[in-house]
Amino acid sequence: MKQYNAKNILNIAIAGHSGSGKTSLAEAIIYTCGGSERLGKVSEGNTILDCDPEEIKRKSSVVAATAPVEWKNHKINLIDTPGLFDFEGGLYEGVRAADSVLITVSGKSGVCVGTEKAVAAADKRGLTKIFFVNGLCDESARFYRVFENLKASFGPSVCPVVVPYIVDGQADCYVNLLEYKAYKLSLIHISEPTRQ
């Protein structure tokens, strides 16, 4: 990895409730950015970020772990934080080192206690937050219900930037509302934008 000026380095904590897909999202980002030749899976115990034997056994993070990726002339340090309350100190460590916090929210469960703790930790440090509604491939996931749940919990400043286009209960593509572009997804690979 090349050397970067401080202005081109971002530290992003990935936080949220246990089981909301923090490590899986981080692994997808690492893979998409070319930081790994394979997509690590928590269920298979082969992720870059959960490499401790206890984490592999639990299928859950117990410490904050960092992985750097390169994207558009920036170095982004992803800080994967634990969601289990027994290891809550890892959440605060990760948020303390971060410039912003990406908060994963389950598309099935919505806002949970871990979501609230992540928001409170980010707010205490005055950090920017972005919510990522995860697990939308599951047919019981409901993006718009979770979005309304987020607004009810954290106020009207919660606004969508990228939303799924749902067909027959499945996310068919994603629409970037700022760019007015739709992106078709095939597993982890994102195609070029198409006009819809």
Task: Enumerate the predicted regions with their spans.
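P-loop NTPase switch module centered on the Walker A-proximal segment
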Residues: 1-105
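Short glycine-/polar-rich loops that comprise or flank the Walker A/P-loop
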Residues: 9, 74, 97-100, 124-129, ...
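Alpha-helical scaffold elements adjacent to nucleotide-binding pockets in ATP/GTP-utilizing enzyme cores
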Residues: 24, 28-29, 90-93, 97, ...
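A secondary-structure boundary/capping signal
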Residues: 65, 81, 132-134, 179
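Conserved Switch II/interswitch segment of TRAFAC-class P-loop GTPases
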Residues: 84-85, 97-116, 123, 127-141
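Canonical P-loop GTPase G-domain recognition
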Residues: 139-187
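Residue-level detector of conserved catalytic or cofactor/ligand-binding positions
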Residues: 186-196
